[in-house]
Amino acid sequence: KADKSVLEQKRPGLNHVGVTEGKKPASVTAYNNEMAKIHDELEAAKTEADRVIHDDNATPAQVTAAIAKIDAVQPKLDNAISLLHDKENNSELVEAKRQLDEAIAEQDPTPGMTQATADNYRAKKAEAERISSEAQGVINNGDATAEEIRDEKAKVEEALTQLTEAKNALKADKSVLEQKRPGLNH
């Protein structure tokens, strides 16, 4: 009777699958493509191993052949699974964007301010809106790298600083007051 212990030890490895939840979309695609390529070979190895394991009259040559099929496909399966990569943590970017969006949503503070300081504030606000939209794109991109997320967070924080500084730099337009009270200027 053929010794099937090695075959029985190796057979469960063919059932390994990659967990795609929380993985970068591009890595999931690579994994799926690789799994599709090896599908037939993998299924054939499983079928052959199961057949030989359950065949009481299997010969040593059949056991050896089944093991060879497993040994041929197992590294390909392991490689496919290794292609999966976790998504990067973007929670700090999400929080920075929330703070920026809060500042953008504030009531317009420019009425009654000098033209130059109001224009500066509006320009910084438009830039902040552009950066916020760009940040949302990075947040939505499951394939974003840690570096891309970090760089975008820095841009968001800079936009918030610029917007806050522009708000603090707003100056009341005194000429409006002077036009309304001409008698006091004499």
Positions of PLM-derived features:
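Beta-rich interaction/scaffold domains
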Residues: 1-186
